[in-house]
Amino acid sequence: MPWFIKTESFTKETLKLLPAQREEFISKHKDWVVNLKKLGKAISSGYLVNENKIPGGGGLLIVEAENFSAAKFLIEQDPMIVYGLVNWEMHQWIPVIGEFPTD
């Protein structure tokens, strides 16, 4: 099955939220990912950091899906997107060399 990658960054409005307010939505996102994993979906999600391990570079989600439409439908259910907290893009990833473990 093909792999799809969603990259995201907080909107300007999201960056204005207090950290506790952002964490509320991030927790909803984490719960969404955990529930998908429990349903057997191959998915991995995390955030990006700089060389000093300081977050702020955005997030990355990798998911296996039947096709582009199915992946987009699934990703559009991410609470970070539903609540309009991130700017995002999705692309199909075609691995050429190596293997990708999902856990």
Language model features: what each stretch is:
Residues 1-103:
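Conserved, structured core segments of small domains
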